[in-house]
């Protein structure tokens, strides 16, 4: 009997002490601590830019010219036409694009959740819209019809198994994103010299053209 009382006492102490435990790791930030300032959105948006900067990779902007008939032997771009491309091969474009799209949608959702009219924050929504258009542009060029996802997905989201969206609908979404981005992005002349490497209104307008 005494043992039962003793064990019950120990369990009660352990349970009461658990109530004060921190479930969030002390070295991690929660959404409640982030997405509050212009700099928070800027730092997150910085993570979208590597998709434009790879030279010898699938995210290289120059590839769309290199895949023309003047450059068919460069980087093995003619591997399909000469029969060297195997059905089992994948260069990761599909996975990479949708991974970036999830990052983009997280940014868009947090901007919208603020209900802000601050142009300094809304410019990063413009950048995210530009990058969403760019990712779908890459998917469209490679695959044609692709699933058009417009929000972040979880592991149990039904959209993970959605059918491909017709090419025309994806094209319209790209053009709309670029138009909306052009309304939020600053002109290059409005930017400080130190930040002129970021996406501008002119870039969105030129891409849309």
Task: Show where each model-derived region lies.
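Short linear capping/connector segments at secondary-structure termini
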Residues: 27-30, 83-85, 151-158
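Active-site neighborhood of glycoside hydrolase catalytic domains
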Residues: 208
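Aromatic-lined, polymer-binding surfaces characteristic
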Residues: 149, 194-205
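Short, solvent-exposed turn/loop segments enriched in Gly/Ser/Thr/Pro and often Arg
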Residues: 59-76, 147, 196-198
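Conserved, well-structured interaction surfaces
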Residues: 38, 42, 50-54, 75-143, ...
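Short, well-structured active-site flanking segments
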Residues: 140-152
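Bacterial Sec-dependent N-terminal signal peptides
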Residues: 1-27
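Membrane-proximal, proline-rich intrinsically disordered regions
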Residues: 18-62
